[in-house]
A protein has these predicted regions:
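Conserved alpha-helix/loop element of class I SAM-dependent methyltransferases that forms part
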Residues: 1-11
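Aromatic pocket-lining residues of Rossmann-like dinucleotide-binding sites
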Residues: 28
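Hydrophobic adenine-recognition pocket in adenosine-nucleotide-binding enzymes
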Residues: 85
Length: 214
């Protein structure tokens, strides 16, 4: 997956929020031998599976847990993973600020976050629809919604600097002369740049943010 590919250097200690059944941790432990991987997962059934794959499992909600009560030390982890997690939290800002304390001075957070600026959502909203679904951009369990600008503000406002932000390639935009006019029927975007258009087609952003100690 894109998220696994973003981990290019072997971390010593990793903490994943919402680790599920431990698939990501299992893959990273195979990729990098000898790493310590701690997972937090609120679903007891998924956590039970993860126990056999990871070094330590905390069965709890990140917004309610006291991490020190589980023996986690400050400035301990090289990497914290939040894959499709932050949009499910009532206060992701507080969570990121808290997690910062558990990162080493040069530690990083990797996160994947849905893009609410996606053109399909905008068109549906124009037509009066904002229909929640079981999966996808309007997953019924999402409680926060982010554009790229808001993602950047969230990380910088909680003590991080973004070192990389990526997304899946957009082949639809390859053979267009920019700036361009793009006609979506009821919506016509005039004199739009490639960067502006890209933000409308991205489904999910992949962010690497480093603890800011300056």
């Amino acid at each position: 997956t894109e998220l696994l590919q973003m981990v290019t250097e072997a971390p010593q200690r990793v903490f994943e929020i919402g680790c599920g059944s431990g698939a990501t941790g299992h893959a990273l432990k195979q990729k990098f031998q000898g790493i310590e991987f701690v997972g937090l997962e609120p679903d007891a059934n998924a956590a039970r599976i993860a126990e056999s794959r990871l070094d330590k499992i905390i069965v709890s909600d990140i917004e309610k847990v006291h991490l020190e009560a589980y023996g986690l030390k400050k400035e301990y982890f090289d990497l914290i993973i939040c894959a499709d997690v932050l949009e499910h939290l009532y206060d992701p800002w507080k969570t990121l600020f808290t997690l910062r304390d558990y990162l080493k001075p040069d530690g990083k957070v990797i996160a994947s976050i849905p893009n609410t600026q996606n053109i399909n959502l905008i068109i549906n909203l124009l037509n009066g629809h904002w229909t929640y679904e079981k999966h996808g951009l309007l997953d019924a369990t999402h409680v926060r919604f982010f554009t790229l600008n808001e993602i950047e503000k969230m990380f910088t406002g909680t003590g991080y600097k973004i070192v990389r932000c990526s997304f899946a390639k957009q082949p639809k935009l390859e053979n267009i002369r920019w700036p361009a006019t793009i006609d979506f029927g009821k919506i016509v975007l005039k004199n739009i740049t490639r960067e502006e258009a890209t933000r409308l087609f991205v489904v999910q952003y992949f962010v690497i943010a480093q603890k800011n100690i300056s």
